[in-house]
Amino acid sequence: LLIGWCCMNFRLTKGNFLKTGAYIDGDSAIFTFAAEKEDACSIVLLDKSGNTACVLDIPAEYSTGSLYSVRVHGFCGNEYAYYFKINGKRCIDPYATRILGREKWNDKTRSENDYEIACGIDNCDFDWKNDSFPEITRDRMKLYKLHVRGFSMDAAGDKKHKGTFEAVSDRINYIKKLGFTSILLMPVYEFEEMTIPVKHDIPEYAKPKYSIRDEQSVSTNKQNDKVNFWGYTSGNYFAVKASYASDASDASNELRRLVERLHKNGMECIVEMYFPDRTDHNLILDALRYWVMSFHVDGFKLLGDKLPVTAIVQDALLSRTKILYDGFDMSVVPQNRTYENLYIDKEEYQFAARMMLNHINCNMYELLNQQKKQGENAGFINYISSNNGFTLSDLFMYNDRHNEANGEKNADGPSWNFSNNYGCEGPSRKRFIREIRKLKWKDAMLLLFLAQGV
């Protein structure tokens, strides 16, 4: 059966409704995606130059419920990119395991093709050999949080490797020598780091009238240079950030090699996942399972409200995967679990510690409770500084935040940080101020190391 227009001899049959997304199955590919039976749906295949190679119109007979599923016989996964067209609108597969078009970080030339991206299929041919999960217990766990690009941009050697998984992999021994057992990666799923201008259609009668001279002086190509460096935004949760790889076409395997090397060193890899409020709960669960099975990650730090936390903690496949979140309903946690995989990650500890260190309304009873707290069914993640607010250095150097230079009018970040500048706002040349600050840094680290949590 040939459907749509196409120069290739593809044959379509019904697919597999139990697995959403696109994947290779023998000499064919199966595409399963969400759409209503009444929708006009097609799969657009692109060649390696990004040009349309084939359009496959999908009839309603291949739909069940709100899903379409079709098997495309004769499909070669590495030859084509794809996207869905639903009722004439270009749609990116939320289950795509590769995203094409963001291979270079903050690539301003993308404006030339309206920032378009397409989907690809990860071949998942990595040989894990005898890889095993370290399963580090919470009494031994020490967590090192990093941003792949920021952590390794100053890496020595080949410029190609700066800011990549490979550069992080080269620093595993450094992290291990510091005494850390686990690394926490800020988002490494594919996300849009660029600020894409929103287009608005203006009726002809409302368009401004320019003279030829005026038109020459009007810039129609203004770009917002703000970059989402951290990645806390909705994303393509099944694809690895291609610009974090030394070889963008092999980003998935480069991350797998990083995880494999961590495991060989007895260390864990935990990844942050941010899900906005309206994210489909089935997609969230599928994404977490996929990262465990495909990338062998050891845990997740979950960010976002209204997440299906109960379903996550009850999921049998995730029962030995560390879950970091700001709270759990312990009444729904299975009682027969032998591995402690739940960790409460919130800012309670840092506030109590900062107030004591900087002598700001310190409550010693509260601090001692924070120092000794340890749940029966869940551990606690303790920290005094993080990427969400003051660094440890800033904590004893500034009374107030100073983010004027980042274009947010000094409004981003917490307005109250329980900090103290000890006599001078910002860096100081005075010896006694510098000595006080050094002592405070040491006090803070000692306080944290003596706490019962992670």
Put a short name on every predicted segment.
Residues 27-31:
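Structural beta-strand segments of beta-rich domains
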